[in-house]
C-alpha cells in the first residue's frame, strides 16, 4: 500500500499548496464569487476514486496560473528520488510530453503557459464548464480522493486540469500493479501453507501410523539379545526325554 499512500499524500500536498499559493499570490478566497462554475466532472473510467470541487476564486487569471505552477514546482521538489523517477513517464502518458527528471519542471511550465494562454482557453466565456478526465484508480480497500480547485478563470482551471491529469495517470500506473502484486502474494502464501501442511502430514504419519514391516523391525529391535551360552545352559538343565524302542513297538 506504500505507493498508493504516497500518491494520496502527494495529491493532498498539492491541493494544500495550490490553495495556499492562490490565496497568497492571486488574492483568491473561498468566499469570492466565481466567474466560472464547475458544472459536471466526468471520469470516463472510475475504478475507486472520489472527487470534490473546491472554490478558490479571484479576478487575476495570470496570477492564478503562476500560483498553480509554483505549487506544482514545490510539490515536485519535495518528492523522493524514487518518486521523481516515475514522473517523466506520467508526463508522456498524460500530456504527451517527452521530458526527463531534470527538465520536467521547465517542460511542464512551458506546456501550461502555452496551452492555458491559447485563444481556445482564454476566449472560453462559458460560465459553467465541465471537466473530463480519462481514468482514475484507487488501491484495493483505499480509494483515491481527488480535489479539483476551481480558480474561477479558464486559465487557472486549465492549469489545475493539467495537474489532475498527471495525478490520475499516476494512479492508473501504480494501483493495478498493486492489485497484481496482491494476487501474487496471495498465491505465494497459499503455496507455502500447502507445503507446510504436506510436511506436517508426512511426519505425523511417521509418528502415529506404523507399517507392518516397521512394527516387525521395532519388535526385533526391542527384543533381548540372548547369548549362545544361554541356549547351552538351557539344554543341559533340561533332561531329555528318552523313548525306548520297545515302547514304540508296543
UniProtKB/Swiss-Prot annotation:
This is Entry-fusion complex associated protein OPG095. Residues 2-183 are virion surface. Induction: Expressed in the late phase of the viral replicative cycle. Component of the entry fusion complex (EFC), which consists of 11 proteins. During cell infection, this complex mediates entry of the virion core into the host cytoplasm by a two-step mechanism consisting of lipid mixing of the viral and cellular membranes and subsequent pore formation. It is a single-pass membrane protein. Residues 2-12 are annotated as: Targeting to MV membrane. Keywords: Disulfide bond, Host-virus interaction, Late protein, Lipoprotein, Membrane, Myristate, Transmembrane, Transmembrane helix, Viral attachment to host cell, Viral envelope protein, Viral penetration into host cytoplasm, Virion, Virus entry into host cell. One of its GO terms (cellular component) is viral envelope. Pfam families: L1R_F9L. A lipid is attached at residue 2 (N-myristoyl glycine). InterPro entries: Virion_mem_poxvirus_L1 (IPR003472). It comes from the Viruses. Belongs to the orthopoxvirus OPG095 family. Myristoylated. Residues 205-250 are intravirion.
